[in-house]
């Protein structure tokens, strides 16, 4: 069997940015069209070439395909998002590191400081939101293309992945338990698979895009 090459730095950066957006805000009408577009289908096909990601991608593809059969899909996805990520009852999956006892308090602020980044004043959520971790990983993968800071950025990438993996599995389990339709449950499973893959829990080497 021919082994598929690992994801390129730029591909990681783009997929992290995409996932950050989906976990940060509700899917609007334009976002729903994009989810069902050929562009996203091509992206998922690219990810699916990696054996470690294939099952998670296939599940998400099924959930995206099912959106066309779901009446008022955009409104129902918005309701799913609100119920999972904005509520505080026991049937939610809050996307904040501080909600999980495994996470060291304030870790994301230290990571952002090391990266020379800060949270935009327009960002109204707490700084430990999942989307901030994913935006940081996106930035770090783009920065890995610059050879003069590759070693430092790669070390920071590993620290960010390790920090995220302290609580991401529990977040994913909460999505699985409480997302009755399953779109965000599938999305969280894909995210966890990608983070594990990036962290080297699967056979992975960072390569530059040709």
Swiss-Prot record:
Biological process (GO) annotations held by this record are: protein complex oligomerization; protein folding
Is Nucleotide-binding among this UniProt entry's keywords?
A: no
What is the protein's known function? Involved in the biogenesis of TorA. Acts on TorA before the insertion of the molybdenum cofactor and, as a result, probably favors a conformation of the apoenzyme that is competent for acquiring the cofactor.
| Annotated protein name in UniProt | Chaperone protein TorD
Q: Which Pfam families match?
A: Nitrate_red_del (PF02613)
Q: Which organism is it from?
A: Salmonella agona (strain SL483)
Q: Name one GO cellular component term.
A: cytoplasm
Matches recorded under InterPro entries: Chaperone_TorD (IPR023069), DMSO/NO3_reduct_chaperone (IPR020945), HscB_C_sf (IPR036386), TorD-like_sf (IPR036411), TorD/DmsD_chaperones (IPR050289)
- What subcellular compartments does it reside in? Cytoplasm
């Amino acid at each position: 069997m021919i082994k598929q090459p690992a994801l390129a730095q730029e591909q990681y950066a783009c997929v992290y940015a995409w996932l950050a957006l989906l976990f940060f805000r509700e899917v609007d009408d334009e976002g729903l069209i994009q989810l069902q577009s050929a562009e996203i289908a091509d992206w998922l096909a690219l990810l699916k070439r990696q054996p470690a990601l294939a099952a998670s991608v296939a599940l998400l593809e099924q959930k995206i395909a099912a959106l066309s059969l779901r009446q008022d899909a955009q409104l129902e996805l918005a309701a799913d998002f609100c119920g999972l990520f904005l509520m505080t009852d026991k049937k939610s999956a809050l996307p904040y590191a501080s909600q999980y006892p495994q996470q060291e308090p304030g870790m994301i602020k230290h990571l952002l400081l090391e990266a020379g980044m800060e949270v935009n004043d327009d960002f109204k959520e707490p700084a430990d939101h999942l989307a901030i971790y994913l935006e940081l990983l996106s930035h770090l993968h783009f920065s890995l293309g610059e050879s003069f800071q590759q070693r430092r950025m790669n070390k920071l990438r590993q620290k960010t992945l390790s920090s995220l993996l302290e609580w991401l599995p529990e977040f994913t389990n909460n999505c699985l338990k409480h997302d009755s339709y399953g779109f965000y449950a599938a999305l969280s499973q894909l995210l966890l698979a990608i983070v594990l893959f990036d962290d080297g829990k699967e056979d992975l080497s960072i390569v530059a895009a040709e």
